């Protein structure tokens, strides 16, 4: 099956990256192990067929993760985003652009998670931080949406360039927005907790 082949490829990639000093086994091995243990959850989200193209001649792909557990909600975006980013990066100068949109980003890009090991959390955040910091060079962009900006990695928040701010009520979130957006005036900050 394609998922098993993917896991095998991930193991080979891990071995290659560790031998080449490009990855730390402790960061990647937990991700692969979690992937192996969550095949059923992944099957709820994705249907794997031979020679399948994620885009299938479409410009937009929506992956709905509402029916899976929290761990899978973190794994699927990580795996897909990392794969697409690396494909784009390896193509060199590419005229096409990729915009990865992460809704409920505070669930995926958070330091606050206590359900996972530190190594896995570090790896997950490192992947998304690289995409948001380096992706523009390769035509890869990220759009994130969240009701809890204070829960998102500060490295990721610091790389954002455009903001649509709606109603925020939590003081930590208001402070995060105020600290992140240097050009936000006092009147605008005071209007955030509408």
What do the predicted segments below correspond to?
Residues 1-130:
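P-loop NTPase motor domains
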Residues 124-194:
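Conserved ATP-driven motor cores of ASCE-family P-loop NTPases powering translocation/secretion/packaging/pilus
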């Amino acid at each position: 099956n394609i998922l098993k082949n993917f896991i095998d490829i991930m193991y080979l990639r891990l071995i290659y990256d560790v031998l080449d000093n490009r990855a730390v086994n402790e960061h990647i091995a937990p991700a692969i192990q979690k992937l192996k243990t969550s095949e059923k959850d992944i099957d709820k989200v994705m249907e794997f067929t031979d020679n399948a193209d994620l885009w299938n001649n479409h410009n937009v792909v929506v992956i709905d993760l509402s029916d899976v557990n929290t761990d899978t909600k973190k794994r699927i975006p990580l795996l897909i985003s990392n794969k697409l980013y690396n494909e784009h990066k390896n193509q060199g100068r590419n005229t096409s652009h990729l915009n990865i949109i992460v809704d409920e980003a505070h669930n995926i890009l958070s330091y606050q998670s206590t359900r996972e090991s530190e190594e896995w959390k570090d790896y997950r955040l490192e992947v998304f931080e690289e995409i948001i910091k380096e992706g523009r060079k390769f035509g890869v962009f990220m759009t994130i949406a969240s009701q809890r900006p204070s829960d998102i990695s500060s490295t990721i928040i610091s790389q954002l360039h455009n903001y649509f701010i709606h109603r925020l009520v939590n003081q930590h979130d208001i402070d995060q927005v105020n600290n992140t957006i240097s050009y936000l005036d006092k009147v605008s900050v005071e209007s955030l907790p509408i």
